[in-house]
């Protein structure tokens, strides 16, 4: 005995095909976004001197070199919170100010005993609009210049 296709069978088949198409398109979009995002990370190398950093809120360091055109020598990094809260750490919001309204906002966490830490930046204004960065902080090997090494991108 042969069954005739019914409207229910046709609707089920149509739903299965549509579902497969949605999954295929979604998969392709996901793959594209992953490969695009991996292309965005560029290397960031920065040095800064911190003779004006006292550990109090509002202290700052000055950029002495950078491979990023937007981050000019003489730009300042302001630390909003005091060091030592919590004990043994600097954990502070930061503003990277390159002048003329070009600023990036982020956060730095640093172990005071070793000088090792991490800074992340999530956006900005002016030339730093859409700026994202993740940098490893290392203490001065020359007694003066702190180092940021990591990656950056612009949305």
Please report, for each region that a protein language model flagged, where it lies by residue.
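Beta-strand-enriched cores of mature, soluble protein domains
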Residues: 30-155
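A detector of low-complexity, intrinsically disordered, Ser/Thr/Gly/Pro/Ala-rich segments
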Residues: 4-7, 22, 45, 60-62
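Bacterial N-terminal signal peptides
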Residues: 13-26
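Bacterial N-terminal signal peptides that target proteins for export
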Residues: 2-14
